[in-house]
Amino acid sequence: MIKQRTLKNEIRATGVGLHTGQKVYLTLRPAPIDAGIVFRRVDLSPAVDIPAHAENVGDTTLSTTLVNGDVRVSTVEHLMSAMAGLGIDNAIVEVSADEVPIMDGSAGPFVFLIQSAGIQEQNAPKKFIRIKKKVVVKDGEKEAAFYPFNGFKVSFGIDFDHPVFKGRKLDATIDFSSTSFVKEISRARTFGFMHEIEYLRSKGLVKGGSLDNAVVVDKYRIMNEDGLRYDDEFVKHKVLDAIGDLYLLGTSLIGEYRAYKSGHGLNNQVLRELMKREDAWELVTFDEEETAPISYIKPLLAV
């Protein structure tokens, strides 16, 4: 059967919070079968747990924020994307502040941490949500939708009226049966416009943002000396974000996600709509790995 997965060992890292600019200590720990991904604020006494579920999303301004009462953990999407890409079902994520460290602005450092900790299969079937019917949410010209598909595929389109985006590939369709999340998606960094960053800083936000953890665009060009990691890094980062946001279903997906100009807010809205539409999905497990439409990197490779 396709089994649930957790980490083999705990692992620690330190980074800065994107919004506070303060140092954040991060610890990833193994968790038991069916625990899911749980964020834990260890700077509070007693510590407060927030399960990584769509209904616990309390804010989607600039990042995806999970809440439990008045306790928050923001910028969870890049770490969630790494968990999804490596098929981790169960883990405790301890943070010493109200946001996950931004690292280099991609999921790459989190992939490295998880692979360094090692991946442990658990003796229980991995659960998947299989899309049975189309579910669409629109907001003006923005759109996000689920479609039935025997595998996992993400199609994303972006549109910016800006010189840097002219002549660049602004859409991507990634079929994960033939594309490696680790190689093709995980290293795509978040991006922002200089004028927006200056405005946000004036409001006390993105204090930790820099050319070390984002692709920054001014009026005419990319400001990062080393340029882009992929020609289509902008849209690939949107795919990365979407994978992290979708993993707040609490299980892996069998289906296609199509989005146009969607962000964290619409990603979350369509998840909530899907959950309400109980005729549009079913929970499935696989006794035989060979019959499954999705496969994951073998744990032995990730030690």
Curated annotation (Swiss-Prot):
Q: Where does Zn(2+) bind?
A: H78, H237, D241
* GO terms for biological process, alphabetical: lipid A biosynthetic process
Q: Which Pfam families match?
A: LpxC
Instruction: Please list the cofactors this protein needs.
Output: Zn(2+)
Keyword Metal-binding among UniProt keywords? yes
The reaction(s) annotated as catalysed by this protein in its Swiss-Prot or TrEMBL entry are: a UDP-3-O-[(3R)-3-hydroxyacyl]-N-acetyl-alpha-D-glucosamine + H2O = a UDP-3-O-[(3R)-3-hydroxyacyl]-alpha-D-glucosamine + acetate
Concerning InterPro entries, the annotation shows: Ribosomal_Su5_D2-typ_SF, UDP-acyl_GlcNac_deAcase, UDP-acyl_GlcNac_deAcase_C, UDP-acyl_N-AcGlcN_deAcase_N
SUPFAM superfamilies attached to this UniProt entry = Ribosomal protein S5 domain 2-like (SSF54211)
EC number of the protein? 3.5.1.108
Annotated metabolic or biological route of this protein: Glycolipid biosynthesis; lipid IV(A) biosynthesis; lipid IV(A) from (3R)-3-hydroxytetradecanoyl-[acyl-carrier-protein] and UDP-N-acetyl-alpha-D-glucosamine: step 2/6
Which one of the record's GO molecular function terms can you name? UDP-3-O-acyl-N-acetylglucosamine deacetylase activity
Superkingdom: Bacteria
Q: Does the keyword Zinc apply?
A: yes
Q: Which keywords, in A-to-Z order, does the entry hold?
A: Hydrolase, Lipid A biosynthesis, Lipid biosynthesis, Lipid metabolism, Metal-binding, Zinc
What positions constitute the catalytic site? H264
User: What class does this enzyme belong to in the EC scheme?
Assistant: hydrolase
The Gene Ontology CC terms held by the record are: membrane
Family from the record: Belongs to the LpxC family.
**NCBIfam families in the record, alphabetically?**
lpxC
What is the documented function of this protein?
Catalyzes the hydrolysis of UDP-3-O-myristoyl-N-acetylglucosamine to form UDP-3-O-myristoylglucosamine and acetate, the committed step in lipid A biosynthesis.
Q: From the Swiss-Prot or TrEMBL record, give the protein name.
A: UDP-3-O-acyl-N-acetylglucosamine deacetylase
Origin species, per record, is Teredinibacter turnerae (strain ATCC 39867 / T7901)
Name the gene for this chain: lpxC
